[in-house]
Amino acid sequence: MKSGTLEKKVDASSRQVAVPLTIIMLATASLHAAVDISSADAQRIGKRIWQNECGGTISGLTSWNVGENFASLGIGHFIWYPKGQRGPFDESFPKLIRFVSAHGAKLPQFLLPGHDTFCPWNSRVEFQQAVDSPKMKQLRQFLVDTIDLQTQFLIARLQDALPKMMAQASDRENVQRQFDRVASNAQGCYALVDYVNFKGEGTLPTERYHGEGWGLLQVLENMHGAQSALDEFAASAKTVLRRRVANSPPERGEARWLSGWLARVDGYAK
């Protein structure tokens, strides 16, 4: 299997896909919050998320976790369902493909328009058996070549998240205030981008256990300004994640992931 680390490959990605990561502004007609993410900060965010999701390795860009019915691909472990399989979680890999294609990335033949949009491997067993197949190697190389664009996609997701959350928030003023507090520095921008990729916006009705969500909206709604912004964000995220695991279907065995999830959000305050 081809291996490597993000430190060795990220510069190559930047050369192969020459799309600048510039200031990203989040705003709507009625909301005046903005998040400024410089090109350098964006690259650091992409590296940290790659480390979080894939251990910073090339092999980790193509994964299929035990107990899941979907592949997890790229630096953000974007979800890709096989044909006939669905679940409560938002399928993000096809959206990534459309995004990078629109920004000029060259797609592998089997990802071009007109081909089947479903994951070509039907199970984790099939996926693992194909780990060194030509198709998997093409996919892995494509993911290496588009690391910068994947980071842009992650940031764009945060850009789209705020109006979605505000449309559903029970206390819009508080959600706006907490978002602005967290977004006031580079570390907070990383926390927002990482969490919305990690656990979603919190706006999909399918992403609920016993009616309780676990996305960015729920984290912000649980904040009230009692601590420093990043300390409170991390504490609120841990509360939301513990609640998710407590509410989760037993057959998913989500408790096995909780310690890793909590360690990840602890990093937001450091």
Give a label for each model feature.
Residues M1, L6, D266-K270:
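Extended alpha-helical regions
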Residues K2-S3, K9-V10, L26, D171-V175:
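A general, composition-driven signal for non-globular sequence regions
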Residues G4-P20:
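Bacterial N-terminal signal peptides that target proteins for export
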Residues A18-A29:
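Bacterial N-terminal signal peptides
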Residues A34-K270:
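Cell-wall polysaccharide-cleaving catalytic domain and substrate-binding groove, primarily
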